[in-house]
Amino acid sequence: MFDQIAGGRTDAVFEYLGSGNPVDSTDAAGVSLIRWCAYYGDVSAIKFLLANGESLDALGANFDLNGVSFHGHWQLCQFLIEQGADVNRPLPGTLETPLHAAFCKSDQPVFDLVADVLLAAGADPNSTTAPAVPTGSFMRDCRTKAETPLHRAAAYGGENAIRMLLDAGAAVDARDMNGDSPLSWASWHQRPAHILAMLCFGQHTIHPEAAQQSARERAAGWRGMEKSLAGTPTHGPAMSEPR
């Protein structure tokens, strides 16, 4: 049954514990039940494990909020923040924050929701990574560049996420270790004109008609059902009391 859980059937933790197995069980590689549930973003399964004696500390430092943000689980991000995870705690070495981790994959609207949750909880949109430190955020042979979350969002984020960062005070003219701005990153990654227009500053401009045409073409992209199935974060009293 553990193999089923590790394969994504995290609902099986209820039967697994009901059969008398320990709450801190691990697979052959030492990965625990709660870590598998976090990998798949199953808040209900995690709550069940906690009610049976497991601890969020088993997820690692800061309840692995960076990892959860990286995987796009906004619901679990919100739960972990309610339980005391620090949205501005950087990883040692790279100094990447959860907000940096939310912008490592391209063209996935669920990361807009992760950014929404993190920013609502006070994430700093101008935090910077360390310069030239190897990072696993892009899986292989990559180093940080003293970049802000907006730099990464310029390359990989959606229009909504970029707007949220700007509205939260992200510096559009921030420079990384190479002197590149978010507009530079967007240009390197050949982002569409309406994204480039959001990041222009100083002498840099995009023709309004090009931006409008780009936005019209983009409107035919993400489907309504895809957005609906991702859910909608709400910001009010915490749904879960800290344990």
Where are the model-predicted features located?
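Ankyrin repeat A-helix N-terminal signature
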Residues: 3-8, 36-42, 67-73, 101-111, ...
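Conserved ankyrin/ankyrin-like repeat signature
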Residues: 12, 44-45, 75-76, 110-114, ...
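Ankyrin repeat domain, specifically the short helix-to-loop turn at the C-terminus of the second helix
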Residues: 14-22, 47-55, 78-86, 116-125, ...
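Ankyrin-repeat-protein effector appendages
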Residues: 1-3, 121, 168, 188-243
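Ankyrin-repeat boundary/"N-cap" motif
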Residues: 1, 26-33, 58-67, 90-104, ...
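N-terminal segments that cap or nucleate solenoid repeat domains
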Residues: 1-36
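Solenoidal tandem-repeat scaffolds enriched in leucines and small polar residues
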Residues: 108, 115, 121-124, 131, ...
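Ankyrin-repeat and related helical/solenoid repeat scaffolds used for protein-protein interactions
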Residues: 147-200, 205-206
